[in-house]
Amino acid sequence: MTELPDSTRWQLWIVAFGFFMQSLDTTIVNTALPSMAQSLGESPLHMHMVIVSYVLTVAVMLPASGWLADKVGVRNIFFTAIVLFTLGSLFCALSGTLNELLLARALQGVGGAMMVPVGRLTVMKIVPREQYMAAMTFVTLPGQVGPLLGPALGGLLVEYASWHWIFLINIPVGIIGAIATLLLMPNYTMQTRRFDLSGFLLLAVGMAVLTLALDGSKGTGLSPLAIAGLVAVGVVALVLYLLHARNNNRALFSLKLFRTRTFSLGLAGSFAGRIGSGMLPFMTPVFLQIGLGFSPFHAGLMMIPMVLGSMGMKRIVVQVVNRFGYRRVLVATTLGLSLITLLFMTTALLGWYYVLPFVLFLQGMVNSTRFSSMNTLTLKDLPDNLASSGNSLLSMIMQLSMSIGVTIAGLLLGLFGSQHVSVDSGTTQTVFMYTWLSMAFIIALPAFIFARVPNDTHQNVAISRRKRSAQ
């Protein structure tokens, strides 16, 4: 890093800025949801869509981000991403209704979808290969700090200012980042193949309408007939994509990926596993505030041990997998996370609040081990010519499953509770108890998938640079 010219180091700072903005926004909103609900006159049970609208948009737009950067140029797309993200933040702060907020969050999601993958692509183009790992470590460090600061900062702003400020703080950062991008970042382009627009649209429609249908009458107020229509449209769109991708060398995601057994198992496990894990960052601060009566700032502080546990475990995941193998690690961490979820609910409802930080720290450790193991299992056996496509599909599935997880969590709250819940009441705690029990069951289910991982899959084979950096 010290051998790089000053111009390159400034460009890396710009990318790191983008990583920080995107990672901060994914966690800062969770703590503010109850306050948003009160301000907008909505039930807290509807506020999961604030998360879903952002994450689902990211999932839909991710496949196009790398192609756009190659076609239009990394500077132009990175600048556009920052501008869209900043405008989305402004519109979020100005929103007077939930529907306005959801549209603004979707605009944020378009910017967020392009920011991180295009940032990775920028690092690949401006840094010599032998310094790539050091450069990526540098630019992703702010992305690790974002989740650490997000919950507490969100709680602090909500408690001592208003929820609008969790979006307003993005505006000066975004303006500085946009100007710096125009002045300092080169506009690399490269020859691209024709974009699979038909496949992209089919996948986008399928993912969006099925997630909307899953939210159902509880969240969107749709009639059973409308929900059935959405399900039919979503299924038809996905089936049409499969027919489109069969024997199509230009398909967005080649079906040849699924000939690799570890990829198929890893992708299925990642999808199911992140549905359960995706519920936790949303449900935990909501439960602490509405179920237990914590202040927004206190609830945000309680999330820090989980992030610290996750960051600390990343250093030894490789040794753990090499020692025990993928199947044992993934089955054990999946069942362990389910038990920890039950432990969190039990200690919280018993009033043992001093134990909660330790439980959340343990949850972060287990979750981090499982995430890292799922990612490497999915990609490690892919041939080089499919590595980039496989990584893109995995990234999309990660975002999609998180949006589905938050949607299911909102559904469970609506199923077990009324449309209006009071803070720290016996009835509310019962609603959360049943929701938490259901979550623990859902979290445990992927263990059946991971149990099918071959016994001899025990070595954590290093992922090539192309696989690590692909979109």
Curated annotation (Swiss-Prot):
It is found in: Cell inner membrane. It is a multi-pass membrane protein. The keyword Transmembrane applies. InterPro entries: EmrB-like, MFS, MFS_dom, MFS_trans_sf, Multi-R_MdtD. The chain crosses the membrane at residues 12-32, 49-69, 77-97, 102-124, 138-158, 165-185, 197-217, 225-245, 263-283, 286-306, 342-362, 396-416, 431-451. SUPFAM superfamilies: MFS general substrate transporter. One of its GO terms (cellular component) is plasma membrane. Keywords: Cell inner membrane, Cell membrane, Membrane, Transmembrane, Transmembrane helix, Transport. This is Putative multidrug resistance protein MdtD. It comes from Shigella sonnei (strain Ss046).
